[in-house]
């Protein structure tokens, strides 16, 4: 084969690979149907979670940037109205909220990743219910609490990241030593089989066993992940800041897009009663509703 023929064959092969890589993923996203709620009293709104027991949404707000104790958690109704702007407020009623990022609802508690602590509040009253210092933590971000009271927090601060584990007796350990291979994890969740799934600055969604051993990875169309939300059918909702969208990935690994043109999707939530995706944006201080098909 001549050199020219080799070049042409290589170019053709590269074109096929590029074309395959460029194939669009299935999408049900419709920007016209994405309802945005802005200018509603939020300030640096990072995370939203559905409180199924009380049919309401809880939203963490960093408040003014800095180390002041001025973060807060707002309550939104399912029709998009803020019914209690500062249900829990740093500096009031004994609450400390300096830089509240991820929140999670379980066991009648609101768990909050805040600065170098895991904080707990009563779900009904908002009263403080304890806190756990996280020695060596850089920036605890997202979190997931299991029914037995174990909490997993992503830490993407510092030069490398990890997953912090807090036992039901408040013992703190690392699921995996700090290492670049963790890709500075942000979104973290625990699946029905007990495995831990996380995603961070890269394009891989990683699965680990309870001892931190890597089980497998799934490469996504885009990365820079925020929250990961497991659904009842074992699929996952995954926020991608790199793609400015939200993916749904089935248990078999099939990926589709369910929301798009979200400038910086934060720690998403899911309303199981309405089959609704909830998307916060921190800087925009907004919430987007996406009713899923």
Per-range role (PLM):
Residues 9-15:
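Bacterial N-terminal signal peptides
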Residues 69-74, 117-119, 161-164, 204-206, ...:
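A short loop-to-beta-strand structural motif that recurs across blades of beta-propeller domains
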Residues 62-64, 115, 156-158, 200-202, ...:
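Short loop/turn segments immediately following the C-termini of beta-strands
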Residues 23-32, 71:
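Blade/loop signatures of beta-propeller domains
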Residues 32-39, 82-94, 127-133, 171-179, ...:
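A short beta-strand motif characteristic of beta-propeller blades
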Residues 41-54, 70, 90-109, 135-154, ...:
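Beta-rich, blade/repeat-based domains predominating
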Residues 76-81, 122-127, 166-171, 209-213, ...:
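Short loop/turn segments that connect beta-strands within beta-propeller blades
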Residues 32, 117-148:
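Asp-box/WD-like beta-propeller blade repeats and closely related beta-sheet repeat scaffolds
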């Amino acid at each position: 084969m001549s050199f020219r023929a080799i070049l042409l064959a290589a170019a053709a092969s590269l074109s096929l690979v590029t074309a395959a890589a460029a194939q669009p993923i299935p999408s049900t996203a419709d920007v016209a149907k994405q309802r945005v709620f802005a200018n509603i009293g939020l300030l640096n709104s990072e995370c939203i979670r559905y409180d199924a027991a009380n049919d309401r949404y809880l939203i963490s707000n960093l408040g003014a940037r800095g180390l002041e104790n001025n973060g807060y958690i707002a309550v939104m109704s399912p029709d998009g109205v803020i019914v209690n702007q500062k249900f829990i407020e740093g500096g009031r009623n004994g609450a400390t909220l300096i830089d509240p990022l991820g929140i999670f609802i379980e066991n009648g508690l609101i768990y909050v990743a805040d600065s170098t602590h895991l904080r707990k509040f009563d779900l009904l009253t908002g009263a403080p219910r304890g806190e756990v210092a996280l020695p060596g933590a850089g920036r605890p971000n997202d979190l997931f609490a299991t029914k037995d009271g174990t909490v997993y927090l992503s830490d993407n601060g510092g030069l490398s990241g990890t997953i912090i584990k807090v036992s039901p007796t408040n013992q703190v350990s690392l699921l995996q030593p700090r290492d670049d291979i963790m890709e500075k994890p942000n979104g973290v969740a625990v699946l029905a089989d007990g495995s831990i799934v996380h995603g961070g600055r890269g394009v891989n969604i990683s699965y680990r066993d309870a001892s931190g051993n890597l089980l497998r990875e799934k490469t996504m169309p885009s990365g820079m992940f925020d929250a990961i939300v497991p659904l009842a059918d074992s699929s996952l909702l995954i926020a991608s800041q790199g793609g400015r969208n939200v993916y749904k990935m089935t248990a078999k690994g099939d990926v589709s897009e369910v929301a798009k043109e979200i400038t910086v999707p934060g720690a998403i939530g899911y309303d199981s009663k309405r089959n609704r995706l909830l998307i916060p944006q921190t800087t925009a201080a907004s919430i987007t509703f996406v009713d899923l098909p």
